[in-house]
Amino acid sequence: LGHDFHSEVDYHRSKDKKMENLKSPTWRNLLNLLKEAGVEPSQCFFTNFFMGLRAGAATTGVFPGRKDARFVAACSAFFLTQLRLMKPRGILVLGSEVPSLIAPLSPQLSPWIGARLGDIDRQQAAPRSAVLFTPDVPACTVVSLIHPSLRHANLRHRTKALGQDAHAHEVELVQRACEELNDN
């Protein structure tokens, strides 16, 4: 679960090529993490919390729609609709913005309310098991990860908060989440 999809410029570029640029930092780093953790991308459903595109070419930073409470509520509702349809057994939450957006949707994610990734790590709350969003969606495992677009630049921050190698920690988080899924 990412933050948002694209800018208008990059969306049209992908549309013209009839595919995403899988060599972009986000895709390249995410696919490498999944591979290292033993997860097949074909077993994944990729989506974002915020729907829509950023105007222009910028793709980093807080999504402009985050300031609009009605838009955030609509995106929350759409996210829950996706959960009802897809019934995921696990959700990998990418980046520092998304945990606080989905935290209000489940009591099991309460440690994530208002928290940044370092706060989540200090609470040892990055992996959350048996997360229930709505009664009609099976409980699932939810894991908070560094956003892959700036993964290598930000690993050092997570290493500092954890007191251990962040890359190895994230691979282990994904592997453990998959083991939990296979046990259920």
What are the functions of these language-model segments?
Residues 3-4, 49, 93-98, 147:
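Short, well-ordered beta-to-alpha junction loops that form the rim of enzyme active sites
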Residues 7-10, 53-57, 98-103, 150-155:
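Short catalytic/ligand-binding loop motif for oxyanion handling, primarily in non-cytosolic enzymes
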Residues 38, 84-86, 134-138:
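Short, conserved loop/helix-junction motifs that constitute active-site signature segments
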Residues 39-54:
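Short, contiguous, well-structured surface segments enriched in hydrophobic/aromatic residues
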Residues 63-76, 103-184:
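C-terminal capping/extension of enzyme domains
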Residues 79-99:
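Proline-aspartate-enriched helix->loop->beta-strand connector
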